[in-house]
Amino acid sequence: MSWQAYVDDHLMCDIEGHEGHRLTAAAIVGQDGSVWAQSATFPQFKPEEMNGIMTDFNEPGHLAPTGLHLGGTKYMVIQGEAGAVIRGKKGSGGITIKKTGQALVFGIYEEPVTPGKCNMVVERLGDYLLEQGL
């Protein structure tokens, strides 16, 4: 399966039990910042934004004082899983980032999608990729 198919079929799909509800943007990005696949709506990010995200995975809490920035949008960092998942909130939406062995899986959402549903979609694919050694 291509990386784009993972984004299209597993991240940007209707959320289980909620027909028509889906993430607003998603991507799979290598830990070096190279985009493997992304939705058309995924924001163009700056290298320093990706560096900040990678630093937070290696030094949990790094982004808490400044917030998580992606494509110029600032998210307030909320409880995640140290070294594995970063979660952010902005207004009625937010972001979930799951780290795998080689990549980062991004999901961005707005209401009516809930933080929990975004976490489920992103982390399920991230866990699958981890199981595959990716």
Swiss-Prot record:
In chain numbering, where does the motif Involved in PIP2 interaction fall? Answer: 84-100
Q: Does the keyword tRNA-binding apply?
A: no
Q: Please list the disulfide bridges.
A: 13-118
Q: Any idea which UniProt keywords this protein has?
A: Actin-binding, Allergen, Cytoplasm, Cytoskeleton, Disulfide bond, Phosphoprotein
Annotated GO CC locations? cell cortex; cytoskeleton
GO MF entries? actin monomer binding
Q: What is its main location?
A: cytoplasm
The superkingdom listed in its UniProt entry is Eukaryota
Q: Where in the cell is it found?
A: Cytoplasm, Cytoskeleton
PTMs per UniProt = Phosphorylated by MAP kinases.
Which residues are modified to Phosphothreonine? 114
Q: Report further notes.
A: The variability of the residues taking part of IgE-binding epitopes might be responsible of the difference in cross-reactivity among olive pollen cultivars, and between distantly related pollen species, leading to a variable range of allergy reactions among atopic patients.
Membership in a protein family: Belongs to the profilin family.
Q: What does this protein do?
A: Binds to actin and affects the structure of the cytoskeleton. At high concentrations, profilin prevents the polymerization of actin, whereas it enhances it at low concentrations.
State how it assembles.
Answer: Occurs in many kinds of cells as a complex with monomeric actin in a 1:1 ratio.
Any idea what this protein is called?
Profilin-4
Q: Output the lineage of the source organism.
A: Eukaryota, Viridiplantae, Streptophyta, Embryophyta, Tracheophyta
